[in-house]
């Protein structure tokens, strides 16, 4: 056998070997073990052949990092889940299509637990929530983009229960109300942007109840006086509400 012939067979063998490797590796994708449970690397695709998700299973359980993609793009995953090897929990991050973090928190069997945080497009903190078994629990905090607190609301069993406060973007309290099972119930107070009390009264099961007090510049006024005062625009001209639909 000539040197040229030997070289031909060697190159042919090497080429076949490397050509075989991807095919061999491909066979290990989307496999089941002897117990008919998913094992190893799994990849799923949308009907347009874009990747839907990629991750790894061990005896049917997700482990490590799973990446989920939107049907419109494969540039950046819209969800990344970091699964624990020793429990059913996963650290979950949601992203915009261009890769900006939207929210993050922990899930256990697809239910939110513990602290979850949400973000403005510029990365600033927008909201903080706490969950127990998939339901809101404890104090929710929403923020303005300048970092000031916008809202503080107490939740129990997934519903508003207890005090709820709202603030201006300068930190001034403008609303303080109470809830019972998602309905306004109890004392209610509303304030001007100056911080002066504007009106106060009581709610019963979502409706105003009894006598409400009204204030202008900290001075108590009648409901009629309050209504007349609200007809004035900032420049002092009267404004008929009936003309607002023009």
Model-identified regions with their sequence ranges:
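Glycine/tyrosine- and acidic-biased, solvent-exposed loop/turn segments at the edges of beta-strands
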Residues: 20-246
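Bacterial Sec-dependent N-terminal signal peptides
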Residues: 1-29
């Amino acid at each position: 056998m000539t040197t040229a012939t030997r070289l031909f067979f060697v190159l042919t063998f090497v080429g076949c070997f490397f050509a075989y490797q991807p095919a061999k590796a491909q066979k290990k994708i989307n496999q089941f073990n002897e117990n008919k449970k998913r094992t190893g690397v799994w990849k799923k695709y949308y009907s347009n052949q874009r990747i839907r998700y990629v991750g790894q299973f061990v005896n049917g359980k997700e482990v490590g990092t799973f990446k989920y993609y939107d049907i419109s793009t494969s540039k950046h995953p819209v969800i990344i889940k970091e699964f624990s090897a020793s429990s059913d929990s996963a650290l979950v991050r949601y992203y915009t299509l261009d890769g900006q973090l939207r929210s993050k928190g922990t899930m256990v069997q697809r239910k939110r637990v513990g602290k979850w945080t949400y973000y403005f497009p510029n990365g600033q903190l927008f909201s903080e929530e706490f969950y127990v078994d998939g339901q809101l629990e404890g104090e929710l905090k929403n923020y303005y983009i300048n970092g000031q607190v916008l809202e503080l609301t107490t939740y129990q069993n997934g519903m508003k229960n207890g005090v709820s406060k709202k603030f201006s973007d300068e930190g001034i309290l403008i609303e303080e109300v109470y809830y019972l099972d998602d309905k306004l119930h109890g004392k209610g107070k509303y304030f001007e942007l100056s911080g002066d009390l504007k009106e106060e009264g009581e709610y019963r099961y979502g409706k105003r109840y009894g006598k409400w007090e009204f204030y202008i510049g900290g001075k108590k006024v009648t409901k009629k006086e309050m209504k007349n005062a609200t007809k004035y625009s900032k420049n002092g001209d009267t404004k008929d509400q009936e003309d607002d639909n023009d």
